[in-house]
C-alpha cells in the first residue's frame, strides 16, 4: 500500500505535456489513493479501512477504483504516450509499437481480472494485476528514455 499510495501522490503532482495529461494522471492518482483507503473483501471483518465502513461498500469502492486505475493507466499508455509532434522519427515509431503492445497487454490483463473475478479465483487477481503493472512499467520506462541505447531520439543541442 505504501508504494501504491506514493505512486498515487506522484501521479497527482505530475504535470504532463498538455492539460489532458494532467487530468488523466490526477484521476489515476485519486483512484490509486482510493484503492489504498478502501480495502477489498476479505471475509474477516464487518467494518474496515480508515473510514470504518461496511466491508461490502469498501470492497465496491476498491474494485471500482481499481478499474479506473488500470483503465486510466492503459489509456495513458495507448493514447497519451503515443502522441507525436509534427515529425515522427523512426525511433518514435518503434517506441509507439512498444506502447501499443504494453497497452494491449494491460487491456487483456483487465479482461483477465474480470474472468478471474467471475470464476472467484482470489489469488489470480494479484497475478493479473502484477502483469498489468509490469506492462505499464515497461511503457513508463520506455517513455522516460531510461534505455538511452534503445529507441531514443538524439537530444537537440541548444
Regions found by a protein language model. Name each.
Residues 1-36, 40:
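Early transmembrane hairpin module of multi-pass membrane proteins
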Residues 1-10, 67-78, 132-143:
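Hydrophobic cores of alpha-helical transmembrane segments in multi-pass inner/ER membrane proteins
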Residues 1-4, 59-70, 96-103, 126-133:
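Alpha-helical transmembrane segments of polytopic membrane proteins
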Residues 9, 70-78, 98-116:
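Hydrophobic core of alpha-helical transmembrane segments in multi-pass integral membrane proteins
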Residues 12-16, 36-43, 74-84, 114-121, ...:
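Transmembrane helix-loop junctions and nearby membrane-interface residues
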Residues 19, 55-63, 118-127:
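Membrane-helix interface and helix-disruption motif detector
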Residues 28-98:
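Membrane-proximal helix-loop-helix units in multi-pass membrane proteins
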Residues 106-158:
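C-terminal transmembrane-bundle signature of multipass membrane proteins
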Amino acid at each position: 500500500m505504501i508504494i501504491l499510495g506514493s505512486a498515487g501522490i506522484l501521479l497527482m503532482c505530475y504535470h504532463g505535456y498538455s492539460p489532458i495529461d494532467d487530468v488523466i494522471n490526477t484521476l489515476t492518482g485519486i483512484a490509486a489513493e482510493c484503492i489504498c483507503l478502501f480495502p477489498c473483501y476479505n471475509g474477516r471483518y464487518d467494518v474496515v479501512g480508515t473510514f470504518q465502513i461496511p466491508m461490502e461498500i469498501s470492497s465496491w469502492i476498491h474494485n471500482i477504483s481499481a478499474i479506473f486505475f488500470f483503465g486510466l493507466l492503459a489509456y495513458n499508455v495507448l493514447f497519451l504516450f503515443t502522441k507525436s509532434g509534427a515529425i515522427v522519427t523512426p525511433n518514435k515509431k518503434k517506441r509507439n509499437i512498444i506502447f501499443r503492445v504494453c497497452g494491449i497487454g494491460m487491456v487483456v490483463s483487465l479482461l483477465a481480472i474480470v474472468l478471474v473475478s467471475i470464476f472467484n479465483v482470489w489469488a489470480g487477481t494479484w497475478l493479473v494485476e502484477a502483469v498489468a503493472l509490469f506492462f505499464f512499467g515497461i511503457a513508463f520506462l520506455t517513455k522516460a528514455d531510461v534505455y538511452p541505447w534503445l529507441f531514443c531520439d538524439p537530444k537537440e543541442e541548444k
